[in-house]
Amino acid sequence: KYYGDNIGPSFFSGQVSCYYFGKQGWSTCRARFGIVNDLYNELVTEGITDVKMMGVNGYQYINDSIDCMICNDECTSSTCSSGPRILPWAQDYDDGVNCTDDNSGLCEADDTLGDIWDMWDITLRDLVILDRDGRYVTRINLTYTNPDSNSTCGQNYETIKQLLISIRNQ
C-alpha cells in the first residue's frame, strides 16, 4: 500500500503513531518488528484503527536485505512463518533533506548516521510513540523491554498495548 511513498510522522497526522527503528538484516530486529506487526493486527481486530505503526531501517544498514524484514516470498526465515507483514518498512537516508528549517542543526547530510535516526537520537530497536498531534510521548527500547509473549509471560507486550490505548484515549 505504501511502497514507493515518502511516509513519516506527518503521514499519520491526527493518529497515535509508533516508529520501530531496526536493522533489516538482523534476526532479533526482524523478530521484534514481527511482534510490532502482530500488535498492530491485534489492535485493528479489536476495532482500534487510529493507532498507526511503521518501521524504519537505519541508513548504516541500507545494504542489508529487506526480504525477511517484510517477509516477502524470498524469505525462508522462521521469523516469517505467519506470512508477509502489513506494516510499512521505510529507509532512512543521509541526504540532509530533513535537516533544514526547524530541524537545522539537528542532523547533517552525509554524516553516515541517517537523518531521522540522528534527529531523534535513535538507538537500535527503539519504539518511539507520538500522540495525535505528532508530539513525542515516550521511547521504549525493545532490546531491554522484549515484547515477545515468551518473555516476561507477555507482560511487556501487554504494557505496550495498554500504553498505546491510553495515549489514544487522551
Q: Could you tell me what each predicted segment is?
A:
Residues 13-18, 46-53, 83-87, 123-125, ...:
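Loop/turn elements at helix/coil->beta-strand transitions in domains of secreted/extracellular proteins
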Residues 16, 20-26, 58:
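Aromatic-flanked redox-active Cys/Sec active sites in thiol-based oxidoreductases
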Residues 27-30, 61-65, 97-101, 106-117, ...:
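Extracytoplasmic/secreted cell-surface and envelope-processing proteins
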Residues 70-124:
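Short, internal strand/loop/helix patches
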Residues 122-170:
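Thiol-/selenol-based redox modules, centered on thioredoxin-like
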